[in-house]
Amino acid sequence: MAANAFVRARIDEDLKNQAADVLAGMGLTISDLVRITLTKVAREKALPFDLREPNQLTIQSIKNSEAGIDVHKAKDADDLFDKLGI
């Protein structure tokens, strides 16, 4: 597929430079990233990344789970259903 269209965007120069440095470390340019991202959007009909950020409760729950705090275990499905009361 021939690359014959241009995409322009106004962004903060410092942000652009930071991103370019990170991408250069990966062997990519900003143009490479835009091309890869747009290709995935066109193919998958969705963003190739999640824009949602976890709220404080979710963040704390993840930390607790990773630390083994307030983690509930079940021996099998029947035990789980009993603990859930179903």
UniProtKB/Swiss-Prot annotation:
GO molecular function list: cis-regulatory region sequence-specific DNA binding; DNA binding; protein homodimerization activity; toxic substance binding
Q: What induces it?
A: Not induced by the DNA damaging agent mitomycin C. Transcription is autorepressed by DinJ or YafQ-(DinJ)2-YafQ via operator 1, repressed by LexA via operator 2.
Entry annotated with the keyword Nucleus: no
One cellular component term (GO) for this entry is:
toxin-antitoxin complex
An example GO biological process term is:
DNA-templated transcription
- What does the similarity note say? Belongs to the RelB/DinJ antitoxin family.
Which purpose does this protein serve, as stated in its record?
Antitoxin component of a type II toxin-antitoxin (TA) system. A labile antitoxin that counteracts the effect of cognate toxin YafQ. YafQ and DinJ together bind their own promoter, and repress its expression. There are 2 operators with imperfect inverted repeats (IR) in the dinJ promoter, YafQ-(DinJ)2-YafQ only binds to the first (most upstream) of them to repress transcription; binding to a single IR is sufficient for activity in vivo and in vitro. DinJ alone is as potent a transcriptional repressor as the heterotetramer and also only needs to bind 1 IR to act. Cell death governed by the MazE-MazF and DinJ-YafQ TA systems seems to play a role in biofilm formation.
Identify this protein by name: Antitoxin DinJ
Which organism is this protein's natural source? Escherichia coli (strain K12)
Name the gene.
Answer: dinJ
